[in-house]
Swiss-Prot record:
Ligand binding (GTP): 82-85
Keywords, in A-Z order: ATP-binding, GTP-binding, Nucleotide-binding
GO molecular function: ATP binding; GTP binding
Protein name: Nucleotide-binding protein Pcryo_0127
Sequence similarity: Belongs to the RapZ-like family.
InterPro entries: P-loop_NTPase, RapZ-like, RapZ-like_N, RapZ_C
Pfam families to which the protein is assigned, alphabetical: PapZ_C (PF22740), RapZ-like_N (PF03668)
Function: Displays ATPase and GTPase activities.
Phylogenetic lineage: Bacteria, Pseudomonadati, Pseudomonadota, Gammaproteobacteria, Moraxellales
Residues engaged in binding ATP: 32-39
Amino acid sequence: MQANQDTHNAQSKLTDSNESTGDKLSILVVSGRSGSGKTSVLNILEDLGFYSIDNLPLSLVPEAAQKLVCDSGIKRIALGVDIRTPRADLSNFDAIHDSLKQTYGEEAVTVMYVTAQEETLVARFNATRRIHPLMVLDTKGVENNVYNLPAAIEKEIQLLQPIFKHADIKIDTSMLNIHQLKERLRDYVGVDNQIVINLLSFGFKYGSPIDADFVFDVRILPNPHWNPTLRSATGLDAEVSAFFADYPEVAEMTGDIATFLNRWLPDFLHNNRHTVTVAIGCTGGKHRSVFITKHLQDRLQNSLPEGLTVTAKHREKHRW
């Protein structure tokens, strides 16, 4: 009965607060794999105007949200939760997630999951000489049935599954430096009242982006790399555009991808999504994927409904 009363009080205060200000409420629950950069994400979110709390026990998330939103009137909140939270809290995340949505509204609550590829996590732990949280003590390692770093990483994936399945935003930091991470987060949360479509060109030879919602492979198209005069150019250069103009299949593929995205992105975004990442890949991420990503940005910005922002990023730009 007391819990229901608290929820009712929170909803009443929230309604009053929203009516008195035009600010949009945003509650981010930030979680993810150890070594993936959750603390960096929370620090950046703080720079972007969020009130950030790290390493919060999951069971205290509803209470923290109520105190910050209803008692203090804070509108942008990022609450960090990691594997150190009690196991019972993790298994109860469905109920916690539903409670937050019911209290503050579907669009106000977002789960952000930060991850990285296993080899990247291993390299980071080795470089910093830090111990994975599941291996802090030998006795704890035995208790968790993990005896080495790869086993701890694998075990953590299983334990965090209740949070991962609710993730609205997934960020893979494997190939991001701190500046790129800040730019990515700004795209996700820095534009109020807008939905962001992130177009990302990349090279398959450097690995596929695991945080993409859609991946299109354009390696079947003619490759300017084999033209010696174009090898040093990129898909943003006029001479590469002229090269592609001689191949109608390039325009056809660009049009087909645009048609697919125009048809399905609006429906995809109706599921309370604030961002969608569309990755376009070629071999090296320099010519074909860059060209198509740029042209898709122009086409989608003019054809998608109002309120959608389309950004274009080129993951391999530092390699050009």
